[in-house]
Structures are given as C-alpha cells and as structure tokens.
Amino acid sequence: MEGSILVPGIQAVKANGHTPGHTAYAVESEGQKLLIWGDLVHAHAVQFARPGVSIEYDIDPKQAIATRRSILKAMAASKSLVAGMHLPFPGIGHVRADGKGRYSWVPIEFAPLSKVENQ
C-alpha cells in the first residue's frame, strides 16, 4: 500500500469509497506495523466473510468494495496489526485469509494492566 508520508513513521493511505477522501493511516515503529483503517468495514460479521457486501452509507459502493478487498488482502498477507471502527473489542487485531476471497477477524489477546502500588 502506498500513500503520503505525513511524518516519519506515519503514512496516509487512500481508502476511497466509503466517503470521498476516506483515509487509512499506516503507523510503523521499531519494526512493528499498524493500519488504522477507519470505516473500511462496517459489519465485521458480514464483510470479512463477504467483502463484496456494501452498506447504504458507502458513497461509492463499487470503490468501497474494491478498497476493502485490496486492504483486507494486503493486511492478511502482511500479518500487520489492524485497528478501526466497528470491530469487536478490543478493536485491534489481525486479518486472516481463507484463500477463497473470504477473511476473518482475529482480535489480539487483551489483559488489563495490574495495579501499580504507591511506593
């Protein structure tokens, strides 16, 4: 995925379709990568398994579908972390491909931090 580098480690990536100018942000630090994709997926239970499904709020449904397919494919291949709206708690995880054009969401493991005692 290509885009404009905003500052070192943060790149704006075109994610057109949902709205004009919809943008994802690729963040990289110390060899780790995260894509914050905004509203790329609206109904995770449907659109991971069937990325060709659009919703009423996509201004350009054909472009939204093409963008979703492209980014899902890239994220599954790269195994990078993904964060975005409309994803199950904790809202950050990985995309897994099934090899048949369908995907699944794999959230990261979440555990609360232990309380730090006053010293």
Q: Language-model features: where?
A:
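Catalytic core of the metallo-beta-lactamase
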Residues: 1-45
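Metallo-beta-lactamase
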Residues: 1-14, 63-70, 76-79
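Generic secondary-structure boundary/loop-capping signal
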Residues: 2-3, 7, 37, 50-54, ...
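Surface-exposed beta-strand edges and their flanking turn/coil or helix-capping segments
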Residues: 25-28, 38-39, 49-51, 97-98, ...
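Short amphipathic alpha-helical interaction segments
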Residues: 32, 56-67
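Active-site gating loops and adjacent loop-to-helix segments of metal-dependent hydrolytic enzymes
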Residues: 42-58, 99-108
